[in-house]
């Protein structure tokens, strides 16, 4: 049989071949229930290794520094995904996470919309939509999502995911940080 010709004599296009290879790769690697499936979260890794979260040791995929206990707990709590290199799982330290999140924001930004538009577009309430902080990648809680709506801030589509800012990464505006001058003067007189 000639290369690129199917059994019935039709020729396969290059895109079709790539799609077939991709499907074959996904079918071989990503089959659920396979014993050699690589864990995606820290909890899955703990189950596979039969270790507790307290015993788990991970390195940062970027700087190769060993993660501290708190960093491992945060990685698990924020439901971040493990990266596997040559069969070894890696996490990410907070410094590298912030650095590469900033790069991702600048390189892969798509567009921004308000909360009500996001609800209409996804046909879900904001509470149901997974929105991560674009600085630290922590999933936003309902209070943080509501703060965006209340203050008229937009959610951003970055690399195919919805993002905003968590309370820890929210930078206050100038009026929030500077006290009102009339109130400041009267407080000095009262003291």
Curated annotation (Swiss-Prot):
A zinc finger (unnamed) spans 60-96, 133-169. SUPFAM superfamilies: E6 C-terminal domain-like. One of its GO terms (molecular function) is DNA binding. Keywords: Activator, DNA-binding, Early protein, Host cytoplasm, Host nucleus, Host-virus interaction, Inhibition of host innate immune response by virus, Metal-binding, Modulation of host cell apoptosis by virus, Transcription, Transcription regulation, Viral immunoevasion, Zinc, Zinc-finger. InterPro entries: E6, E6_sf. One of its GO terms (cellular component) is host cell cytoplasm. It holds the Pfam family E6. GO terms for biological process: DNA-templated transcription; regulation of DNA-templated transcription; symbiont-mediated perturbation of host apoptosis; symbiont-mediated perturbation of host ubiquitin-like protein modification; symbiont-mediated suppression of host innate immune response; symbiont-mediated suppression of host type I interferon-mediated signaling pathway. It comes from the Viruses. It is found in: Host cytoplasm; Host nucleus. Belongs to the low risk human alphapapillomavirus family. The cancer-causing human papillomavirus E6 protein has a unique carboxy terminal PDZ domain containing substrate but low risk E6s do not possess this domain. Plays a major role in the induction and maintenance of cellular transformation. E6 associates with host UBE3A/E6-AP ubiquitin-protein ligase and modulates its activity. Sequesters tumor suppressor TP53 in the host cytoplasm and modulates its activity by interacting with host EP300 that results in the reduction of TP53 acetylation and activation. In turn, apoptosis induced by DNA damage is inhibited. E6 also protects host keratinocytes from apoptosis by mediating the degradation of host BAK1. May also inhibit host immune response. Belongs to the papillomaviridae E6 protein family. Forms homodimers. Interacts with ubiquitin-protein ligase UBE3A/E6-AP; this interaction stimulates UBE3A ubiquitin activity. Interacts with host TP53 and EP300; this interaction inhibits TP53 activity. This is Protein E6. It comes from Macaca mulata papillomavirus 1 (Rhpv 1).
């Amino acid at each position: 049989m000639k290369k690129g010709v199917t059994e019935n004599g039709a020729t396969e296009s290059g895109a079709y071949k790539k799609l077939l290879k991709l499907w074959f790769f996904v079918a071989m690697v990503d089959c659920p229930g396979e014993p050699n499936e690589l864990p995606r979260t820290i909890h899955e890794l703990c189950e596979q290794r039969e270790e507790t979260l307290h015993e788990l040791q991970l390195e940062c995929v970027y700087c190769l520094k060993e993660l501290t206990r708190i960093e491992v707990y945060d990685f698990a709590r924020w439901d971040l995904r493990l990266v596997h290199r040559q069969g070894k799982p890696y996490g990410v330290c907070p410094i590298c996470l912030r650095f590469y999140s900033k790069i991702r924001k600048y390189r892969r930004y798509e567009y921004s919309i308000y909360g009500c538009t996001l609800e209409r577009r996804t046909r879900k309430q904001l509470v149901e939509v997974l929105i991560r902080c674009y600085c630290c990648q922590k999933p936003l809680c309902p209070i943080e999502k509501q703060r965006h709506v209340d203050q008229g801030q937009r959610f951003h589509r970055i690399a195919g995911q919805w993002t905003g800012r968590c309370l820890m990464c929210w930078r206050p505006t100038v009026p929030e940080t500077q006290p009102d001058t009339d109130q400041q003067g009267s407080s000095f007189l009262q003291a």
